[in-house]
């Protein structure tokens, strides 16, 4: 049985999560074990995950997850230099020369873990599956204008 462990995000104000309770329900029905970490900032409450049979773990417990667990998150891991075991699904930003990418890869090498970088998740035609949607650019422009306007006062 595949065990998916949804970790709490570490970045301040990061309320997103890559798996909804409905998605967790689908995985559970397919035979997956799903563990979701507590999170003080996640936009989705734990009750929905509980209701579909997910296990709940304390925030930041993923380093102690069973060895066979696949750790799933969106953004970067804590930059504490510890070796990384497990298989991790996340936006690693490690293969295009991004800042900290080589350090992250060395941590995986030291811990024997594996990074499945969502930036490289593609379909059979090579099209990215985990990409920004159509409206992301407009939302980014709106937030930029709002920040600029706030700086003018």
List the model feature ranges, each with a label:
Residues 2-3, 79-153:
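Glycine/serine-rich phosphate-binding loop and adjoining beta1-alpha1 elements at the start
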Residues 2-107:
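An N-terminal-biased, well-structured beta-alpha scaffold segment characteristic
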